[in-house]
Structure formats: structure tokens, C-alpha cells
Amino acid sequence: MDGLRQRFERFLEQRNLATEALGALEAKTGVDKRYLATGAATLLSLYLLFGYGAPLLCSLIGFAYPAYASIKAIESPSKEDDTVWLTYWVVYGLFGLAEFFSDLLLSWFPFYYAGKCAFLLFCMAPGPWNGAHMLYHRIIRPLFLKHHEAVDSIVSDISGRALDVAAGMTKDAGKVSVNQLQKAK
């Protein structure tokens, strides 16, 4: 528990948008920013558990900060932060795909959105206990390496067929257009 408290304290010492807002609120109210941050986290948690807009809030948490951090990573000269956020987006995408098929059932479970939000926060957590990194290296990457050649072959075949169909449709549309123009004259 002390490790979590120390990380929380270190977070509050960093200079970022959240800590600046907490500092301004602390100056106006006289309430310590640790209590303000704890209160905000508690309200957020309660809203995720019982609030009407929990799906939207959870989606914003899972998308807004990672999108911002991804843009910062793209603009930075380092490749390592790019890899961190690409890994997150791979896991996020696969989670979204799995959720598409199970959401109707899972959304009826109590505290589903709180659990989903906790999972997404786990996936974007900094440091060695980053959930996206763990899931990618333990599950996704081994499956990818095992099956990527077969998937590449299927995708190549499908894209070739799609191009053939599109070319045929374009030809047919051109013929129909020419015929219609000739009939109109």
C-alpha cells in the first residue's frame, strides 16, 4: 500500500494539466490537493459504478489520454514511446473487437464499466506493469507469430479478389454510363 501512496505522491508532484488544476483548486479552497485528488477519484469511481453516462466516460478515459499521449509520442524523437502507444492501440483494438461481441451480455453485469475502465487504465499504466505490454508479449505476439503467414495469405487473396471485383464494377459502371448518355442523345 505504501508503494501506491508513494506513486500517488509522485504523481501529485509532477507538473501537468491535472496537477496544475489541483494546485489552483487548492489555492482557492485551502483544501490539500491530495484530498481533492482522492475526492475526484472517488467521485469518478462512483459515477462509473452508478452513473448514467458510464459507457461514455469509460470510452473517454480509454481514448482521450492515450490519443493525446500518442500524438506526443509521434512528435517526439524517441521510438520507444511510439512502441508503447502502438502496443496500447493493438490491445485496445482487440479489446474493442471482443467487446463488440460480448458487450450486450457484459453490460448487464454490475460494475462492468468500472471493470472496463480499470482494465483500460491497467493497459495504459506507465512502467513495467503496463497491461498492454504484458498482454501483447504474453498473448497477442505469440499468436501473431504463429498465424501471421496464414493471415497474410488470406488477406492477400481477399484484397486481390476485392480489387478484381472493384475493377469489374468500374468497367460495368462506365459501360452503363456510356449507354445512358447515348440513349439520352
Curated annotation (Swiss-Prot):
Entry keywords, A to Z: Cytoplasmic vesicle, Endoplasmic reticulum, Membrane, Transmembrane, Transmembrane helix
Location comes to: Endoplasmic reticulum membrane; Cytoplasmic vesicle, Clathrin-coated vesicle membrane
Tissue specificity field: Expressed in the retina (at protein level).
Q: Name one GO cellular component term.
A: photoreceptor inner segment
| Family in the record | Belongs to the DP1 family.
Self-association state and partner proteins as the record states = Interacts with STX3. Interacts with clathrin.
Keyword Translocase (UniProt): no
Q: List the disulfide bonds.
A: none
What is this protein's name?
Receptor expression-enhancing protein 6
Q: How does it sit in the membrane?
A: Multi-pass membrane protein
Top-level taxon of origin: Eukaryota
InterPro entries registered for this protein in UniProt = TB2_DP1_HVA22 (IPR004345)
Provide the GO biological process annotations.
detection of light stimulus involved in visual perception
User: TM spans, by residue?
Assistant: 43-63, 89-109
Query: What does the function comment of this entry state?
Result: Required for correct function and survival of retinal photoreceptors. Required for retinal development. In rod photoreceptors, facilitates stability and/or trafficking of guanylate cyclases and is required to maintain endoplasmic reticulum and mitochondrial homeostasis. May play a role in clathrin-coated intracellular vesicle trafficking of proteins from the endoplasmic reticulum to the retinal rod plasma membrane.
Write one Pfam family the protein is assigned to: TB2_DP1_HVA22
